[in-house]
Amino acid sequence: MGWARLESALGRVPEGVDVEVRWRPYEIHAEVQPEGMPVEDLPYSPEQWAQMQEALRQSAAEEGLEVGKRPKVSNTHRALMAGEYARVEEAERFPAFHEALFKGYFAEGRDLGDPAVVEDIARSAGLDVGRMTKALDGGEYEGAITATTDTARQLGITGTPTFVFDKRFAVVGAQPVEALLQAIDEALKHTEEE
């Protein structure tokens, strides 16, 4: 939802204003084992989990997005590394891959902790899966995930989405489009003052 709202906000930015979006990986649940964590093991009662998921589904529907049922929380470390690979090595395919990962996880309930699932999604986005797998298996993007997650935590970022504008203004969570536009406006004002 955060991504959809950001896209809506960017569509309302005045003509002539350049906004550069830089996606960065952030590992929320590094403690989740590679095989994932059943939702029953989360620190919520079944009722709380059901309410949270229903609220998520309703909010997503308002943005024209679908959220399906997920039987577990995936360990997304490999998917994050694959995203970083795509961003750096095959940048023109990164947006499609990024979107396909979100759709796979949220709408289709796919397990992003399963390397075969990540490879399938990468293939569907047109990535060179052989090259990507070699890079991931070789640990090429391991450090990038750790570094960006550590930096984010040092800045007080504890969840996603978090949008940082002009390295000064943060909008945390899937906030309304108006909140994102306000942050963009504040960043532009500070840029003009400098």
Model-assigned labels for residue ranges:
Residues M1-V19, W23, E84-E194:
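C-terminal cap of thioredoxin/glutaredoxin-like
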Residues W3-Y105:
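Structural alpha/beta surface segment adjacent to cysteine/selenocysteine redox centers
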